[in-house]
Regions:
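Noncatalytic, solvent-exposed loop/strand surfaces
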Residues: 1-226
Length: 226
């Protein structure tokens, strides 16, 4: 079993039968969610801005990649971490590792959407998702008002990535396998393609706020309200 101890920045490997610790590895920041197993490697991100690959058998570091554009730190929830943290759970799809670095598209230059070789850590591609419409180059808020109606805003917060086999999803934001944001504007409910239905949470899969009720949704997206 591979378990992340979030606030101690440590990943533990446990014997599934006895619970005995086999090895542990400590990073420079929080590990906010479980790691990903892939062909003998344990792959995960950390709030220190790096992606790690450990050998599953002994916890030895195979490679480490800095997903953050620069190694700059800040205080967050009483701990030091990167201005561009990486979620613990990374996505593997068609032998490519996908992850994001950053908190929000509107701060610190946006979110970095990265594609890595999971075996070597080699960078295969990077897309910066920021406050500009990728289709027109306009300010996203102004461009979005032209594409939709009502009190709605595009997805901007980072979250654990999911995949339906055809596209990648960050909350309800559709992203192509080569890192392009797709279908920025809203669609009419009756015209939404059922093939795009997926499980997401509008507040993020990692939201642990006690006083805010959030639900996992199976669909294409949700709209805002007043």
């Amino acid at each position: 079993l591979f378990v992340a101890s979030i606030d101690t920045h440590t990943l533990h490997a446990l014997n599934a039968k006895t619970g005995r610790k086999v090895w542990s590895y400590t990073t420079g920041g929080r590990i906010d969610s479980p790691p990903t197993y892939y062909k003998g490697l344990i792959l995960f991100g950390s709030a220190d801005g790096y992606v790690y690959a450990l050998r599953a058998g002994d916890g030895i570091l195979a490679w480490r990649f800095r997903a953050a554009p620069v190694d700059r730190r800040m205080m967050a929830w009483e701990q030091l971490e990167s201005a561009w943290p990486v979620h613990g759970s990374v996505l593997i799809q068609k032998n490519v590792l996908y992850c994001t670095a950053g908190r929000n598209m509107y701060v610190e230059g946006g979110i970095r959407f990265l594609r890595l070789d999971p075996a070597t850590g080699k960078l295969l591609g990077e897309t910066v998702m920021n406050d500009k419409d990728p289709e027109t180059g306009e300010d996203m808020h102004l461009a979005y008002l032209k594409k939709t109606q009502g009190n709605n805003m595009p997805v901007a917060h980072s979250d654990i990535l999911t995949c339906d086999g055809r596209n990648i999803w960050m909350r309800s934001q559709k992203i192509s396998l080569d890192g392009k944001r797709l279908e920025i504007g809203l669609e009419k409910v009756e015209e939404q393609n059922p093939k795009d239905f997926h499980i997401f949470c509008q507040n993020g899969f990692l939201d642990d706020s006690y006083f805010f009720r959030s639900y996992w949704t199976f669909g294409r997206r949700v709209t805002g309200g007043y």
